[in-house]
Amino acid sequence: MTTTQIIKPKRIAYYLRYCQNVHYFASIKPFLDYFISCGIHQNHVVVRRLAHGYQEIADYRGYTHLFTDDCDLVSYDLILTPTFLRDDEEGAQHLAVQIFHGMSDKPFTYQRNFSQYLLCLCAGQRQLDRLHSYECNHRMPATMVGYPKFDRIPANPPLYKNEKKAVIYCPTWRKGNMSSIELFLSNVDIIHVLAERYNLIVKPHPNIFNPEREFYESRIVAQLEQLPNIRLIRSGNVMGWFSQADLFVGDISASGYEWLYFNRPMVFLNPQPGVLKPSQDSNAWTYLWQCGPVCDNVRELPTLIANELNSDSYSDVRETVLHYSIFNPRGGTATQLAVAHILALLSSS
């Protein structure tokens, strides 16, 4: 005689906070897909306000029926969140699993107090080390699982159909004066040179397009949309576009850590020349900058790109940083490991 364990359905909140946080959605999507396929638990994509036209956002296609503005977080059995719970949401921390939406070098990610969370799922050792460098997180519940977005890279349609090399530029958002976007846009002649030589893809941080977020400026969006001979990408998951590119140009963008998966050349456009410099200190804002040359003068950007495409001398460094930053980066097991931890929490609640 065998007994079958009956699993009680639970209400799971996937908390994005802002409806247009497509990069947050990309980080919870592997878990959402898993629990939808199980057909047991109730899955709710929770936002504070359902933005006008959110049903038309390409990243949300097939999932919009799960969106809700029921933000009574303590009414859910478990919260999976790539955002960071704020002071007025502290009462929900004991239900929350932190799904880090990237591997940022920005310090304000790690200064937050995660000690009351159920669990923090970290991409790798670097993230753990940075979190533990703050006293408030010495006892935080955390484990390394890898980076779920690496498990299944989308097969996006080709942006170009020619033999040119492809360069992808990924500026971060404008918080803390860390973005190179305005420096880039103020040198239109350099953009024209790059667009003539290469297949130029521009994929800004999604917050640059989000009017609900601080530092949004419609003029920047308008300038981006008016750039000729480029492909402008609005997407929460850059991995499928990265697979089509030969070289990455970034600044303090966490997407650079995702680019490491491909081990292809990188160039960093310095948003604060003379102030920010490359560093091997894993707590530095510019730790990733050891993985490629830093451009302190935007006029030199075309030359640096050409040099790196012709002779890449940073491959070994990139691999070292990748394996320190991400547990088993190309093993395809991150989602599986993370889900096992989440299932254990669900069964104990």
Enumerate the predicted regions with their spans.
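Catalytic binding pocket for nucleotide-activated donors in carbohydrate/polymer assembly enzymes
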Residues: 138-139, 254-326
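Nucleotide-activated donor-dependent transferases that construct or modify glycoconjugates
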Residues: 4-21, 169
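Active-site and donor-binding regions of nucleotide-sugar-utilizing enzymes
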Residues: 13-154
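C-terminal alpha-helical cap of glycosyltransferases
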Residues: 330-349
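A donor-sugar binding/catalytic signature common to diverse glycosyltransferases
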Residues: 88-98, 236-278
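Catalytic donor nucleotide-activated moiety binding site of glycosyltransferases and closely related
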Residues: 43-59, 195-234
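Conserved catalytic-core segment of nucleotide-activated headgroup transferases in glycan assembly
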Residues: 20-38, 142-145, 149-220, 295, ...
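Donor nucleotide-activated moiety binding/catalytic core segment of transferases
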Residues: 67-71, 214-257
